[in-house]
Design a protein with these regions (language model features):
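Acidic/His- and Gly-rich active-site-bordering loop/insert found
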Residues: 9-149, 171-175
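An extended, acidic, His-containing surface patch that forms the Zn2+-binding/catalytic region
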Residues: 95, 99, 105, 111-113, ...
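A common structural junction motif
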Residues: 122-123, 273-278, 375-383
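Short, solvent-exposed loop/turn segments at the edges of secondary structure
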Residues: 134, 176, 207, 228, ...
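Acidic/histidine-rich catalytic neighborhood of metal-dependent amide-processing enzymes
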Residues: 146, 152-232
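A short core secondary-structure module
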Residues: 196, 200, 255-278
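Short, solvent-exposed beta-strand/turn "edge" segments of beta-rich domains on protein surfaces
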Residues: 236, 257-259, 328, 345-350
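Short amphipathic alpha-helices in soluble, non-transmembrane regions
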Residues: 260, 370-378
């Protein structure tokens, strides 16, 4: 080794040592703020029981939304329960019924100010009872949980928002600005219910300072190396694409098969896509903010890694896609082949076969760019792409804005043991529709939930803790009452 090369290597080693030392110092400096206060308000045992019974009554109504159907019978039954349980809301708030989608307004003292809106959805996904411990629409209260479809997603949100407003109105509360409640009937099937509410605001020339929907929640161990509660506030939703990829051929009898049949070409395409995962990996500003926010609540090795994106960013881009699908979703467009079709008989080669791919475009590689990547591989196998639906990621809420800061403040006051941080959502909510009339769309469900409860939301044995439900009512009440 020549003296020049040795000097270069020595200099590089010195730079690396300095960089690691700076990273270690930064990791030591990153600390979660001390928060030893008690929650701002607690429900009494009587209130806690009442809240559980109200949610149970709502869960017992099977408001399952179905594509191509517009039967509001069960939704009207649910709304009758809500009128009974939240009398002050329906007596004092101005109700606009948009084909079952409810929009309620409590007028504020200053009619010139923009309002705030709390939202959720009345509909639930189907539940056939298979693998359920109890009837999915029993609303059973047992072992300090409310059991049933919609208990977590998201009748708990609707119940807590309406209950909070009902109590505030009963206490004579007069808000400084208009306060709205919006609840749709077809969120689970991406229906147009919430768009009717958005159209209402557009027609009247109204804007909102803040819109808050379901989304992130309060989870323990949300990320590896994070042994505490974290309140994840969804500030951005990834995009959504459904695309049908078709292969055409001459068909024929399976006894004399040609090469490269439609199914063979589709199989090769799917295999290559699964093997290469060809979408761009990047740490976007939103994900960077999420990691830096999470770092303060993590063990030292993870704090050093996520608290120093400037140094470890390239390493994270390699590691995260390999850690888990959950981690990969933060840094890349994800895709999954979900449907397929071909011949109608076992001995017939189809003249056309297809697969459907669902993609969730990242904010750094939008729907158009993600489709270009997919089409590049489809062209290789002489496949046609038919885009069924495509939309980009939502806008990102202003992380330095007053509304995000206020929500974090309320989380600190009501859940002092949970650190609040911005969160990138892989799934979708109705909230994105309100971007047309609101600059600060936040997605947060103030519910402490376990990983098991999170996994059960569209599966069997959906539950919510009774104490956690009560705490969420008090959160919404605190949030609305103290909004200036």
């Amino acid at each position: 080794m020549g003296p020049y090369i040795a000097a270069v290597l020595l200099a590089l080693a010195a730079v690396l040592v300095v960089a690691l030392a700076l990273a270690a110092v930064q990791a030591i400096r990153i600390k979660a703020p001390a928060n030893t206060r008690e929650p701002a308000d607690r429900a009494t045992p009587e209130e806690t029981q009442k809240y559980a019974e109200t949610l149970a009554a709502m869960v017992q109504i099977p408001t399952v939304s179905k594509r191509g159907e517009n039967d509001l019978t069960e939704f009207r039954r649910l709304q009758a329960v809500m009128r009974e349980r939240f009398p002050h809301v329906f007596e004092k708030m101005e109700l606009t019924d948009l084909d079952g989608n409810l929009l309620l307004r409590l007028p504020g003292k200053d009619p010139n100010r923009n309002g705030i809106l709390l939202m959720g959805h009345q509909d639930v996904v189907p539940a056939d009872g298979k693998d359920w411990k109890h009837d999915p629409f029993s609303g059973l209260i047992e072992n300090d949980v409310v059991f049933g479809r919609g208990a977590m997603d998201c009748k708990c949100t609707v119940m807590a928002e309406f209950q909070a407003m009902d109590e505030l109105i009963a206490e004579g509360y007069e808000p400084p600005c208009d306060v709205y409640l919006s609840t749709s009937v077809n969120e689970e099937i991406s229906g147009g219910g919430v768009q009717k509410a958005v159209a209402y605001f557009k027609e009247k020339g109204l804007r909102l300072d803040l819109c808050m929907d379901e989304g992130g929640a309060i989870m323990h161990g949300m990320l590896p190396g994070m042994p505490v509660w974290a309140a994840a506030v969804g500030v951005l939703e990834k995009g959504y694409i459904d695309v049908k990829i078709k292969a055409k051929g001459s068909g024929g009898h399976s006894s004399t098969p040609p090469k490269n049949t439609p199914i063979a070409r589709l199989s090769a395409f799917v295999t290559e896509m699964e093997k290469k995962h060809p979408f761009k990996v990047a740490i976007s500003p939103t994900v960077k903010a999420m990691f830096e926010g999470a770092a303060a609540y993590m063990t030292f090795p993870m704090r050093m890694l996520l608290g120093n994106i400037w140094l470890f960013g390239p390493l994270l881009k390699v590691l995260l896609p390999k850690v888990s699908p959950f981690a990969e979703a933060f840094v890349s467009t994800t895709f999954c082949f979900t449907m397929s079709g071909g011949s109608t008989a076992a001995n017939v080669i189809p003249d056309e076969a297809y697969v459907v791919c669902n993609l969730r475009p990242s904010e750094h590689q939008n729907a158009e760019e993600s489709l270009k990547v997919l089409k590049k591989y489809a062209d290789k196998y002489d496949l046609e792409c038919e885009v069924i639906i495509a939309r980009n990621a939502s806008n990102c809420a202003k992380l330095d804005g007053e509304e995000f800061a206020y929500l974090k403040q309320c989380i600190d006051e009501c859940y002092p043991d949970a650190g609040a941080l911005p969160y990138l959502m892989a799934g979708g909510t109705d909230c994105r529709q309100f971007e047309a009339v609101c600059d600060s769309c936040l997605r947060f469900c103030p519910i402490k939930m376990t990983q098991e409860q999170l996994a059960a939301m569209h599966a069997a044995n959906e539950t919510i803790g009774v104490p956690e439900l009560a705490a969420s009512v008090k959160f919404y009440k605190h949030f609305v009452k103290n909004h200036k």
